[in-house]
Structure formats: structure tokens, C-alpha cells
Amino acid sequence: MKLSEIETAVEGLQGVGPSTAKLFSKMGIFTVADLLSTYPRDYEDRTKKIPLSEYKTAKVHTVCKVTGYEWFGYGRMKTLKIAVTDGTAQAWLVAFNRPFLQKSLPEGSLVSVTGQFIEKYGQLQSSAFDAVKIADTGDINDWQNKTAPDSAVLPIYPLTEGLSQKVFRKTVALALKQYGMGIDDEIPQEIISERKLLSKKQALVYVHVPATISQAKEARATLIYEELYLFEQKMALRALEHRGTLPADSEKNQLQNATSSLTKEKFAASLSPKQKQLFERLEFDLTRDQMQSIFEMNAEIDRSQNENNSMENSAWNLQRNPFSMQRLLQGDVGSGKTLAAFFVCLRVVDYGGQCAVLAPTELLARQHADNAAKRLGPLGVKVAFLTANIKSAGRENLLKALKTGDIDIVIGTHALFSRNTNYKKLQLAVIDEQHRFGVAQRESIVAKGRVSEGKYTHTPDVLMMSATPIPQTLALTVFGDLDISTIRTMPEGRKSIKTYLSVMGHEANVYEAVRKELQAGRQAYFVYPRISEESQENQDKSLKSAQEMFTFLSNKVYPEYKCALVHGKTEETEQNALLDSFRDGTTNILVATTVVEVGVDVPNATCMVIEHADRFGLAELHQLRGRVGRGSAQSYCFLIYGKNITQTGIERLKALHETTDGFKIAEEDLKLRGPGEVSGTVQSGYLTLNIADLARDKEVLKTARLDAINFLQKQQKI
């Protein structure tokens, strides 16, 4: 039986009553499987003797003789003090609320003492101690070179109020005794042997009741590997289900593609008619990585088509390959991911299909729609913009055109998968900033194009795009069932953004540096963590607000320049007008909140000032910085932080100061925040790890992934 299949309630264990079971339930522990899967967070090694004389270096664990008692305080506040010695020093055990110890540890008895000792009032004392009697009497000198009989490695579990380590350990021991020997391995035996792992039952014993610290380490190594192996196995099977191949096949192809020489001529020859038109109209060259990514995605779009559905006849045919593209396109800020996605949309249009481009905000959706209309409209592609704010008459006509197939590419927000939105032939769903959408929302847009015929169900091709690079370990876990295309190279002519750190109180220096850029005809952003002083009750009132600073900057600092204020509560029509004014250069300074994190592309803007930068996340700061550096001029980012910045905050800002490489920043973000907070993985609904840590165990992850895929490949051949 697998551990996860043991559904016996904790209350069913001997000695576990309703009140104890209720305490366990507060920790999410309801069954024996939950209990045995709650691993110790640490261990206390009581196998080594640490005498009183070494109290400064470690927690004391020694055998002492009780030499007397004292009491201090009055009435209910009266407290027992027990005098002890282990032959190396004298000490006092301060027994708050434990008067019964006078009887259980009588004078002259030998006791095993474990605790943290400090010097206080001229005495060596401990108030947080364990003391167990081992003999009624005896010579302390006989124990100088011996450890106490209760010596052991004790697991330290996470607890909830009212639940003690003693009760937790006892309950785990009962569960192991009753169910431990019947637990089966979940990893294939050949891999257990090859990787020199423990069996599952042995690993559970060693992790919960280790005889030595090395046993505990061995058990944890096995359980970490097992967790990652099973996760990768699940991802591989999911990939097999929706694309017909295991991840290893795709990775091998990607590696071959990456190392092959994809020339500009070979790339051009692979393009569909409308793709070729766009390629020839571009006023700049695509980067190597853009061409490679488009080439990879084209191959998958072609694969998902049936041979009877060629570009020549553009006939939509339900008898398509049952497997569809499931790909993540990642790249740094400003690397050209959107243009690559437009190329793929054109291939789908050439096949006679429709595309839906989903963005999390109206601002970003509008930018995509404007760019698509500008670049794809002249090619005869019908592009539409759809959000919840579209007026009823126009909306009705738009929805009708979508349903009849008169629209090729629709770009918008959540309205794309609303109940009243229907497509004639949705073939590609592009999901930008995929981490901003939950699993159910992604499924909703895909479901709009899912069709069935006979035994096959065809699902639209899916292209997800990330705003910033995905850490490698997340790419192998959360996105382990996807093919991944990566754009590392930036467009030619871009200069690396120079980033400077400044502490609050020295803003004037930053403002002066920005003034020089404004005098040169450039533009600037100023970003703040809140809208106004009254914007949110739970926000720190000491934080500057966008509204307050707009007034200050426009009246006091830059009265000669035109400033605009944009935030999340700005009306859509007004926001569009303000942003258009900034884009065309009429407005010199844009004061904003993080609403400008995405969806604003102004090549002439060269300064990004972020005040209270320590209040923003690393990925968020990198994304904001990416609003500048989009032209050929040198750009600057100024991060102004508070004087009470935390150590983590300092590390975050240092990472930005030291590099503009989004891939390095993504890895640093993973270290600082953990996988659960990076790239929306909590929202994605995929990642729940119990003992493994992606930042710490990334090499184990790679090994487990390869093992899982290789084993499944062998099973396929059999």
C-alpha cells in the first residue's frame, strides 16, 4: 500500500483522543498518511555529551547530580530552583510552574539534563530544560566518559499551540508501529538500486526515529528525491497526454535546433505567406533567438495540422492531429516575445484559424492590439480588441464577427472567455503574463476552441508568455509539461540600463540627474507604492504616494516640464489619453503606480525613478526597470530605498544593481522568496512540495526528471 492510500484517521491511533486529533487538524493533519508525511524541521542530537562547562558553545546534554533546592518568590509565584553539578561546573535549573520536580528529582539522584544555559545573577542557569532521572543515587565521576541512557536523536516537528513535541513523537511512533512495515515503494526498484536510495518504509523510520544524524540525512535525501521524481513523472505523463511525446524528446529536439545553424535564409524559407510578408516589412532584423523560437513554434503548429488541412486550401478540418502545442515562450523584458507571438498567429491565420491573445490588464491588451493593428493590419489580417468596457453596440457586432470567423485575431482581457464570447475556429490561444491567470482561467479560454469528432478531441494550440524569465528549477517543475522557447538575445542597438541605489534623504541628487536627461529631450517615469495618502487603510502612511509626489514634482521640482499622473483608479479614457500624450512626447514626466509595469513602450523614456524601492518585489522592480532602455539612448534606473530597509531588501536591490540579466535575477528571486511566491506558482495550482526545496535541491531535481522520463520511455518501448 502506498503511503498516500492510508486513509485511517489520526484519531484511530491508540491514545489519540478527540482533543489531540483536533490539534493535529489545525496543522492539516487528518490521516495517518498526513502524519507520516509531516517531516521534522530539525533534530536535536542527544547522542553526544556536552558538559556544563561548554554551555557557551552548544546546548548542554550531560549527566548531573542533584545537590539541593531553593525557592524564590511568594504564593503562586513561588518557583523551584534545583542545584546540579556534572563535575565540570555547578548550575541551577529554574523550574517555572514545575514544583513537582522536587519529588521526581530528589536530592542525591542522578539526572540526564538537556538545555540552553546562560549566566544570570552570577549563576549558571537554565529555565528551558529537560531533566530525566536515571538513578536514585550514584557517583557523578562514574559518568565522566559515558553518555546518558536516554541519549537519542530527537526529531523537532512544527507544532500548533497546545501540541507538544512529546505527544507528536509518540503519535508518529504509534503510526509507524502499526502501518510502517506495510508501506510500499513508489519509485521503481531499479531506480532505488541505481540511486542507492532507502526503501520508503526504511526512509520513514529513519526520518522520524533516527539513531544518528546521518540516518536522518540519508532518509531526507531519499524522500526529497522521491517527491521530485513523482512530480516529474506526473508532468511527463501530462505532456504525453496533450502533445504525444515525452519532455525528453522535445528537449532533445530543442538542443539540436539550438546548436544547429538556423540561417536567415533557412528561416525565411520556412515562413508561411503572411509571416513572410511581415518579415520583409520589418524595419529591423529579428534576433537569433526570436528566429529560433518562431521556427520551433512553426514546427508545432504544422504538426497539429492534418495533412488534409494545408495552407494552400486553408480549409478548416476537424480531423486534425489530436495533439496540440503546449509551449511557454520566455524572455527578458523587451526581448521581443510579443513580436514572436504575432508571427505564430500569422501562421495560424494562414491555416484558416483564429487566434485569441489574452492579457491580464486592459493597458497591456490595448498595447498589443495597437501593435497588431499597425503591423498585421496592412497584411489583410482582421484584428479586434475586446474587453468588458467595450460599449454594447460595438460589442455585439464584434462578438458576431468572432462567431462567423470574420475576425482573425482578437486581443483582450477576461472578456475573451466570457460566456457570450464564441469563436468559429479558435486554433491558438496566446496567454500573456501567464502567471497572472489561474488554472481555471487558462482552461476557460482553451475550452472555447475545443472540438470533438469521433474518438478524438482537438484542443487549441496554447502559447503562454512570461513577463520575465522563469528560474530553471520552476521550468522543470511547474512548467515541466510544456515545451519552452527562450529568447535571451536583445535587439541590436540596445544599451544596458545603468542602475543606481540611493537612500531616502538624497532624492535631490536623483532629481538633478533626471533633469539632465529631460534637458536632452528625454522622458522619465516616477513610480510610487500607493496612489494617495487615503488610498489604503492598511498601508504605511510614511510611504510617499503618487498623487502627493505628482503635485510636488510638477510644482516644485520640474515646473517647466509637463507631468501626468496615472494609477489603477484612473478612468480608462483618461488613462489612454495620458499615456498617448506620454508616447508622443507631449508629456515629459509620467508619475505612476505599478500600473505602468507592463503595457507602456516609449523608446524616448530613459529614466525610471522608483521611490520606496524596498517595498517592491525583485521581479516587479526588474519589470518596471524594463520600461526604459527601449531605444538606442543610454537609460538609467534609480532605486530609492528607506533607511529601515531589511537585509532581504538590501539583497534584492543589490541584485538589481549588479545585473540587468533577467535570467540571473529570476534565480535570485527564487532564492529570496521561494518557489511558492515566484511566477505565481501558488496561483498556478501546480506546485506543492513537502520536503524538497527547489533552490536547494535543483541538482536532485534534474536527476529525478531525467530518471522519470527515461523510465517512462522504457515503458513505452515495452
Protein language model regions, located:
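Inter-lobe coupling/hinge segments of SF2-like helicase ATPases
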Residues: N308, F323-K654, K714-K717
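Long, highly charged, low-complexity intrinsically disordered interaction regions
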Residues: M1-G12, F231
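C-terminal accessory region of SF2 helicases/translocases
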Residues: S632, I645-I718
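Short boundary/loop segments of OB/S1/cold-shock single-stranded nucleic-acid-binding domains
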Residues: R41-A58
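Upstream accessory/linker segments immediately N-terminal to the RecA-like ATPase cores of bacterial MutS
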Residues: F72-A258, L262-E280
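N-terminal pre-P-loop "Q-motif" helix
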Residues: F284-S304
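Structural detector for short beta-strands of small beta-barrel domains
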Residues: K56-R76, G115
